[in-house]
């Protein structure tokens, strides 16, 4: 992987990730394909929304179908027939979200398989091996996603262990002869001094890109903005920056303003299945009765298949009847909305008009522009 940085506007960056499998224009949003599929979508439909890279879930694909089934097909690209690049998370977030059924040790994490209850162990080395078999174009290190809230002492211990695991991840990744990209993950909760230590330690180890982890886990939005403003300038400018698990459209806008290049989140697909649809002027809850006889498109400014062909009334009808097509059409629209938003941000950065874009984005939604505390 090669990262090319074209231009900046304030702290926002316009560039691209270049892989053997294709080019990803940045800032980029990655749809989430947890089980080897973006829920309800064919790879061709996902590509048609404008997505150039997707995310796969190491933890879930390890449990089902497993490494051996994956290797029978070649890798995850062959298994799911996605032709572009794939980023896989390390499995750390899913393991730590298991709560009481897992035990963290210096060696790794012991837990119960949530499917059948069998005891399982996952460590940095195993995570690197699974992601190698998946053929991931971007591999994420195995870390502990520090929960929120966490006091300073716990966050410090968690961050320090994640640094040790980062070195183990790097060593095993290199030992496998993996020629793809490996990203480090910056931890430290909401504490700037801990984030400083994490960034410094990861840069000393050396990675192809750097993710900001442990945000969007319940902390106030102001804390997320503060940490991004503090951390992003410390990440080497020639490496991509990835904000994990984020988020709402406004979170993408604010991340870009602070220098983030990559995002992922289940929100557009999960919300689509619940009839919660993103449009230029805000949000449409399609199951509300007021849409029952509305013959207008979901978003007159959207060029997606759904908006070009169907009315709000039809989408309302499908949702109320729990028809599968409704969830699919909603997903197509929400994914396209996110890709249109990212394209708009990229164009605004190219033209040096990002803050004008941001102002209009919030005006259309009837909300104030959040403060940006950067030099």
From Swiss-Prot:
Its cofactor is Zn(2+). Binds 1 zinc ion per subunit. Residues 245-251, 269-273 are annotated as: RNA binding. Zn(2+) binds at residues 302, 304, 307, 333. InterPro entries: ArchSynthase1/Queuine_TRR, TGT, TGT-like_sf, tRNA_ribo_trans-like. GO terms for cellular component: cytosol. Pathway: tRNA modification; tRNA-queuosine biosynthesis. It is an enzyme of class 2 (transferase). GO terms for biological process: queuosine biosynthetic process; tRNA wobble guanine modification; tRNA-guanine transglycosylation. Keywords: Glycosyltransferase, Metal-binding, Queuosine biosynthesis, Transferase, tRNA processing, Zinc. Substrate binds at residues 89-93, 143, 187, 214. Pfam families: TGT. It catalyses: 7-aminomethyl-7-carbaguanine + guanosine(34) in tRNA = 7-aminomethyl-7-carbaguanosine(34) in tRNA + guanine. Its EC number is 2.4.2.29. It comes from the Bacteria. The active site is at 89 (proton acceptor), 264 (nucleophile). GO terms for molecular function: metal ion binding; tRNA-guanosine(34) queuine transglycosylase activity. Homodimer. Within each dimer, one monomer is responsible for RNA recognition and catalysis, while the other monomer binds to the replacement base PreQ1. Belongs to the queuine tRNA-ribosyltransferase family. Catalyzes the base-exchange of a guanine (G) residue with the queuine precursor 7-aminomethyl-7-deazaguanine (PreQ1) at position 34 (anticodon wobble position) in tRNAs with GU(N) anticodons (tRNA-Asp, -Asn, -His and -Tyr). Catalysis occurs through a double-displacement mechanism. The nucleophile active site attacks the C1' of nucleotide 34 to detach the guanine base from the RNA, forming a covalent enzyme-RNA intermediate. The proton acceptor active site deprotonates the incoming PreQ1, allowing a nucleophilic attack on the C1' of the ribose to form the product. This is Queuine tRNA-ribosyltransferase. The lineage of its organism: Bacteria, Pseudomonadati, Pseudomonadota, Gammaproteobacteria, Enterobacterales.
